[in-house]
């Protein structure tokens, strides 16, 4: 029997033994599962190596042209709605050391029991490889996501799309217990500042500085928000 599909002969078989079905309707035959080689670590994420890098790695030098650091096998490999988290980690650590206290602060008595495990994963499996080779495989980041998901009250970090502030709340506030970067005149403290502004009809495309100034200019007298001191780190949540 000649089996033909769209005028092309694909294979020969006995009569009534050949059938075409959508690939979504087939599954691997479990009888042959034992003959398959065991999967290697990281196999599902491609052949690109992403080794653990212990020790100290300085931030990657700044570049004039971002195209030189873009392209295939550059940055953090995405997996299961990780884009928000990948972009946040890349911007926090690749070219700057302002967040390096997370990597080197010794565990205190008030820290969680798995503090060292989270810190080592962040430093040796994500930050150092980023700074050294500008690539981190998704399974390395998934390890951190799994830790944060189990150690904080922010759930769904392993597969759901979140806002960056939810990730920062899990990592900075709940797990690593980083001192707040901002202290406001109201007495509130925070790790990031949300820019709340009204649209200015006189500005077509506002800069970050425009939005920042306008946000702090909102209100009068005691209701106007001010910074008590210049923050060591300023993370801004932009208006949408």
Can you say where each PLM-predicted feature lies in the sequence?
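UBL (ubiquitin/ubiquitin-like) substrate-recognition surfaces
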Residues: 1-240
């Amino acid at each position: 029997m000649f089996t033909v599909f769209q005028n092309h002969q694909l294979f020969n078989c006995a009569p009534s033994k050949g059938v075409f079905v959508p690939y979504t309707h087939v599954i691997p035959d479990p009888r042959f599962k034992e003959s398959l080689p065991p999967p290697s670590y990281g196999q599902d994420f491609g052949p690109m190596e992403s080794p653990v890098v212990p020790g100290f790695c300085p931030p990657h030098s700044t570049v004039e042209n971002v195209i030189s650091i873009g392209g295939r096998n550059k940055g953090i490999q995405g997996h299961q709605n990780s884009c928000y988290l990948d972009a946040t980690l890349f911007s926090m650590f690749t070219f700057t050391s302002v967040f390096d206290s997370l990597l080197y602060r010794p565990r205190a008595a008030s820290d969680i029991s798995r503090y060292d495990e989270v810190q080592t994963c962040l430093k040796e499996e994500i930050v150092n490889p980023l700074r050294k080779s500008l690539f981190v495989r998704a399974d390395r980041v998934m390890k951190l996501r799994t830790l944060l998901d189990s150690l904080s009250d922010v759930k769904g970090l392993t597969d759901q799309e979140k806002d960056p502030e939810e990730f920062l709340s899990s990592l900075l506030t709940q797990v690593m217990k980083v001192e707040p970067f901002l202290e406001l005149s109201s007495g509130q403290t925070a790790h990031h500042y949300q820019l709340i502004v009204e649209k200015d009809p006189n500005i077509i495309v506002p800069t970050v500085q425009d939005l920042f100034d306008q946000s702090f200019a909102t209100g009068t007298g005691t209701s106007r928000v001010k910074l008590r001191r210049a923050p060591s780190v300023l993370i801004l949540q932009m208006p949408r």
